[in-house]
């Protein structure tokens, strides 16, 4: 789904005309676009299979690690350290400094453009935004409920796909190993 299509979905719900360009002077389109961006960042900040990457980064000669990614969050993937970003550099929150002498393994939650989202995630954001803008402008009625229900349907599809991509397995648990080792008596 394109960002323009998501904006037009919101405009049609409000009973307004579609726009042909994303950079229009229509105030409702601007409202829809800002709500779409806010909800997109809210969705992505959770971290899903499509916007979480793990990287090992090496500090430069002066000890800094530049953070070139358009990230929403940075987590440690190798130890119990806590990291943040300060002035474009990785910052160790535990040690309170930004100087590193060894490579660091990071888990990075990326901020993706709307067009780069998987279809179900884009539809989730578009319908959630439509429901939210509709509720703020026209109040809650059956149309609002329909958009909210559609958003929940796409949300469940995204969560199902996320779970599938995580490859969780109960066969790797301690309880499953106990069952495999057990001797069954007949």
From Swiss-Prot:
InterPro entries, A to Z: Tail_Gp11
Listed EC numbers: 3.2.1.28
Main localization category: virion
Reactions it catalyzes: alpha,alpha-trehalose + H2O = alpha-D-glucose + beta-D-glucose
Compartments (UniProt record): Virion
Keyword list, A-Z: Degradation of host capsule during virus entry, Degradation of host cell envelope components during virus entry, Glycosidase, Host-virus interaction, Hydrolase, Viral attachment to host adhesion receptor, Viral attachment to host cell, Virion, Virus entry into host cell
Any coiled-coil regions, as ranges: none
One of the GO BP terms on file: symbiont entry into host cell via disruption of host cell envelope
Pfam families: Tube
An annotated Gene Ontology molecular function: hydrolase activity, acting on glycosyl bonds
Cellular component, GO, one term: virion component
Family: Belongs to the tail tubular protein gp11 family.
Function: Structural component of the tail, which functions as a receptor binding protein (RBP) and mediates the attachment to the host capsular exopolysaccharides. Displays a depolymerase activity that specifically degrades the polysaccharides of Klebsiella pneumoniae capsule, which allows the phage to reach the host cell membrane and bind the entry receptor. Hydrolyzes trehalose.
Protein name as it appears in the record: Tail tubular protein A
